[in-house]
Amino acid sequence: MIEHNPTTIYGTTIVTVRKDGKVVIAGDGQVSLGNTVMKGNARKVRRIGKGNVIAGFAGATADAFTLLERLEAKLEQYPDQLMRASVELTKDWRTDRYLRKLEAMMLVADSKVTLALTGTGDVLEPEQGVMAIGSGGNYALAAARALIETDKSAEEIARKAMNIAADICIYTNHNIIVESLDAQ
């Protein structure tokens, strides 16, 4: 878990759901500086590459943008190979002195795979089609897992999970941004 430094800007909860031919990443819009909400409508989920990859990030905002840019560069180097680009990014992240200090995590997805990327070099795939990161990640993950076997769509599950996380976590708000792709 990322420790909260009161002088660092944080962005918080991201959840991904893969179900019934869709993959969704949803995130809230709150950015906090210590105990203060600095912005309520930040966009922490976006399309990258040629629009065929969606990414969501949690952690220190500037660090997350740095990693997002690096992932886009890896996707240019390894087009249509999200797994390979992600592994190469995490190798750099783990071994580069500058990158190693970055405090952020990312969830990324394309039509074939969903991954969590961490600064410890982990590239993780979800077992049950759901993953979540950030300060409200555990709440969102529990909610999404509880709903994955229902008849709700991937987007409905992601939105409900984010709303539950926002009800519980003070670093997460109800301004939810959702991006989705068709999945295999």
Curated annotation (Swiss-Prot):
Reaction equations catalysed: ATP-dependent cleavage of peptide bonds with broad specificity
Compartments it resides in: Cytoplasm
CDD domains: protease_HslV (cd01913)
Active site per the UniProt annotation: T12
InterPro entries reported for this sequence: ATP-dep_Prtase_HsIV_su, Ntn_hydrolases_N, Proteasome_sua/b, Proteasome_suB-type
Any GO CC annotation of this UniProt entry: HslUV protease complex
Regulation of protein activity: Allosterically activated by HslU binding.
UniProt-annotated binding residues for Na(+): A166, C169, T172
Keyword field: Allosteric enzyme, Cytoplasm, Hydrolase, Metal-binding, Protease, Sodium, Threonine protease
Superkingdom to which the source organism belongs: Bacteria
Entry's EC annotation: 3.4.25.2
Function: Protease subunit of a proteasome-like degradation complex believed to be a general protein degrading machinery.
Quaternary structure note: A double ring-shaped homohexamer of HslV is capped on each side by a ring-shaped HslU homohexamer. The assembly of the HslU/HslV complex is dependent on binding of ATP.
Family per similarity comment: Belongs to the peptidase T1B family. HslV subfamily.
Protein name: ATP-dependent protease subunit HslV
Gene responsible for this protein: hslV
